[in-house]
Amino acid sequence: MSKSAVSPSEARRWYVRGRVQGVGYRDFAQRAAVQLGLTGYARNLDDGRVEVYAVGPPSKLSELAGMLYRGPRWSDVRGIEEQEAAITSYDSFRIR
């Protein structure tokens, strides 16, 4: 049995920098994550970045990463730091 059959979920955390606050970025991240069936959260950080944490199948996390790089229309993503993260259970994807 493959590892993916035993443990289908992983967790990732992204720190997104650029013009990502006040432009609907967290709403965009939430819509994308819900569309992909992921759980977690998106929140603004004091330093101007947005933190996105998501749990789900690796293929869906990769899809979300691509969407986060594009961002919503008014955003200007200048860089993303991606990290593997410990899995924390959430029942939905929320904006904090």
Curated annotation (Swiss-Prot):
Keyword Hydrolase attributed: yes
Secretion signal: which residues? none
Keywords attached to this entry: Hydrolase
According to its UniProt record, the EC number is: 3.6.1.7
Residue stretches making up the Acylphosphatase-like domain: 11-96
Entry GO MF terms: acylphosphatase activity
Annotated active site: 26, 44
Catalytic activity annotation: an acyl phosphate + H2O = a carboxylate + phosphate + H(+)
Q: Provide an example Pfam family for this protein.
A: Acylphosphatase
Q: What class of enzyme is it?
A: hydrolase
The answer on whether this UniProt entry bears the keyword Transport reads no
Tell me its family: Belongs to the acylphosphatase family.
The entry's protein name is Acylphosphatase
